[in-house]
Amino acid sequence: MKLIVITTPQFFEGEAEAVTSLFQNGLEMLHLRKPGASAEEMGNFLQQLPMEYMPRIVTHEQFQLASVFGLKGIHLNGRNPQIPSGYKGHVSRSCHSLEEVLKHKSDCNYVFLSPIYDSISKEGYSSAYSCDTLQKAQQAGIICLLYTSDAAD
């Protein structure tokens, strides 16, 4: 099993300490997702983390920080949909349809597909995929399910 955490959209007091603790206790990868954060804010946050964890962090914003801090890579999304010119590192992407997965998965190390579950933070943002749809997409080789449960039926 891989433990991957996506940060909350806003910085919070004690976040660097919490992230450090997560890494110390088995976190494999952190997706640093701070929409609207400046390069300075993101850099200040990264400077609070031990350097040994930088190669396990993927940034969703301020892609130039990937090379400055030696981050694992970048994550493409609706706000930042293009790989920067000349970038050769790790790339992941958010996809919101199986068609998007098919279009982008060959250009990425991996993709996130959502919404799989009803959102607890976005009102009215409901699951877009039945278990059957996901299983068929897996059988067709479109996606790789990391976790399935019959309890969801």
Language model features with spans:
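A short acidic, helix-capping loop that chelates divalent metal ions and anchors anionic groups
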Residues: 117-123
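Alpha-helix-loop-beta-strand connector modules within alpha/beta enzyme cores
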Residues: 49-56, 92-94, 128-145
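Conserved small/polar residues in nucleotide/adenosyl-binding loops
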Residues: 147-153
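Short, conserved loop/helix-junction motifs that constitute active-site signature segments
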Residues: 85-87
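Non-cysteine beta-strand/loop elements that form the S-adenosyl-L-methionine
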Residues: 109-117
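Conserved N-terminal beta1-alpha1 strand-loop-helix module at the mouth
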Residues: 1-75, 79-81, 91-108
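Glycine-rich tight-turn/loop motif centered on a GG-T
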Residues: 38-39, 123-128
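A general structural signal for well-ordered alpha-helical segments in protein cores
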Residues: 42, 46, 113, 130-134
